[in-house]
Amino acid sequence: MTIDETKKKKMLSYRWLVFIALAIAYFFVYFHRTTGGAISTTLMDYFGVGTASVALLASAYLYAYTLMQIPSGILTDRMGPRKAATIFVALIAVGSLLSAYSATANDFNLMIAGKFIIGIGAAVVYIPIMKVLAVWFRKNEFATMSGILLLVGNVGGIAAATPMVLMMDALGIEMTYIVLAIITALIALLVWLLVRNHPMEKDLPSIEEIVSEETGQPITESTSEKMGTVEALKRTFLSGRNFWPLAIWFFVMYGTIMLWQASQAGAYYKNIGGFDAGTAGMMLTMVGVGMVFGCPLAGKLSDSYLHSRKKVVIIGTVVYTLIWAFIYLTADSADILTNEMIQYVINFCFGFFGGFFVVSYAQIKELYPIAMAGTSTAALNLFPFAGGAILITIAGFLVTDQTLDQYKTVWLMALGLMVLGCICAFLSKEKEHDA
């Protein structure tokens, strides 16, 4: 079958509008995920609460996000990415409004409730985007596009630091969250207007039809196929090496990233390294900057050069593990720990190679039928956030007096877990790609 060239060009152009609308939404997913640390002092002063309450606020988002991972996959496969993303981006706006009202009522519990609602909404954004990438983009573009998406997300994470603090200083807590609610509501409208579940909804050829014409190969799988929820879950969780090595790997990989970036590193630099809060914050910003470069590069390496998901995952995991070894082994060295340049480089490399995790989404997607792309990706995505929640909780019990020995115990735990992560990366499976 010959494809109309005009429709083909329109499809290959329109998909970028779909991606841009969803990427803007994902910017704010990352923004809300990482904003707590930067404004923690402001919140403590305004509401009269302590560090434990602020930690609870951060974990409210995390636990909501984790709990919604499997439902997000089911909702995406059943409702379609367009409706699922629109509804739950709008829910982020609702959570932002509740956060604004918490400042008016001077009720920190309402702020926590607002953060929890934001977490629920944010959880059902990433999986619809993964489904859209699977339907609108070629298979050899998936990892690259995932990397670009994570780049956008990490820019959102960077914006959640100093820019958020400046905005809150200028507008106050209430008006800041009202502005965020309005922006998010407009983004939900943009998603509804631009996103389509499948090219056929705009009378355009599917990506598999385009690829078939380009390669001369017959279509073996349709992006319009659907599968029952129970069947998709069974095929995911009972698939042995297709799923579990990657799941365990992601648990420890992203769990240790969050352990460092979102929990212990700031206090470690302040209490052991002797840095002020501003300098420590700038050092940790380099983790996000590293990911801005590492995520898209990993995707490009996977799609265009190494033609392998697994090799890229292994490279990133091994180097990331070596960075943890460096952190642990040099913790006793005051000359290294107090050297700002070394710590900036370490945090950049930490984020750069840690960001190679993005390729795992392409790896898992290709091991299952396209009809269960949402469910299989959501099942995998359950583990990194569970890893972060659990490891941060464990670290909280281990670091009670904030002594060097206690931090070293946590770093050793992270290093040991990453050795396990390396083993799992080597044991993981991938679909073979043509060079």
Go through the PLM ranges and name each one:
Residues 149-202:
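Helix-loop-helix hairpin linking two adjacent transmembrane segments in secondary transporters
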Residues 67-108:
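Conserved MFS/SLC helix-loop-helix module at the cytosolic interface between two early adjacent transmembrane helices
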Residues 36-40, 240-299, 388-396:
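Extracytoplasmic gate region of multi-pass secondary transporters
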